[in-house]
């Protein structure tokens, strides 16, 4: 039980770190996009001033960036993801069983021992493939304890696929709904 708990904590810590890094990259992309838009507006304003030669119209200043802002593409993808809530496909092809549900659970045969699961555990038959639940971009692929783990960004959302025997995608790849990832 301690080994399983230690491995789960190690995996969760790695995933949390990668998600934090992905959020920071998205924040920087959004800031860069906002900077480019501001520069384009400034250039257009300067062009308007020189062409009209009289009077200026004050444009409202753009709002300051929030702690986490998204690019336009990420906002659109997030909206699509939310709109499909409850309609997303299973992240595995073929027959499967759910071996562990989300949240705390008691370990069979051990009194007063509880573990916490941050997702659901799905076991497929040999040859089953893990697949993306929605369009997105692969944020990270890493190996831990000999198994592959994949994080896919869907705008403001990230889906995590753990304990895969192989990975058929790499960081930066664009994936579509139901595409095999491992």
List where the protein language model places each region.
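Short C-terminal domain-edge/linker segments immediately following a structured domain
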Residues: 126-131, 152-153, 164-170, 181-182
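Extracytoplasmic/periplasmic cell wall- or extracellular glycan-interacting regions that localize
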Residues: 2-140, 146, 153, 160
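Short histidine-centered loop motifs in beta-beta connectors
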Residues: 141, 157-178
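Short hydrophobic beta/alpha edge segments that flank linear recognition/processing sites
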Residues: 122, 149-150, 176-182
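Generic structural signal for buried aliphatic residues
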Residues: 96, 136, 175-181
């Amino acid at each position: 039980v301690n080994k399983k708990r230690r491995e789960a904590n190690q995996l969760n810590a790695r995933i949390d770190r990668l998600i934090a890094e992905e959020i920071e990259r998205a924040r920087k992309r959004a800031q860069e996009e906002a900077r480019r838009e501001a520069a384009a507006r400034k250039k257009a304003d300067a062009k308007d001033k020189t062409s009209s030669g009289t009077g200026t119209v004050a444009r409202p200043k753009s709002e300051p960036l929030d702690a986490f802002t998204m690019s336009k593409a990420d906002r659109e993808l997030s909206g699509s993801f939310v709109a499909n809530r409850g309609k997303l496909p299973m992240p595995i092809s073929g027959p499967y069983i759910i071996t562990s549900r989300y949240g705390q659970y008691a370990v069979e045969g051990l009194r007063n021992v509880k573990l916490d699961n941050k997702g659901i555990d799905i076991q497929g038959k040999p040859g089953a493939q893990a697949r993306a639940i929605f369009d997105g971009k692969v944020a990270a692929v890493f190996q831990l304890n000999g198994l592959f783990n994949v994080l896919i960004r869907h705008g403001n959302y990230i889906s995590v696929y753990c304990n895969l025997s192989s990975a058929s995608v790499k960081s930066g790849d664009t994936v579509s709904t139901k595409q095999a990832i491992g």
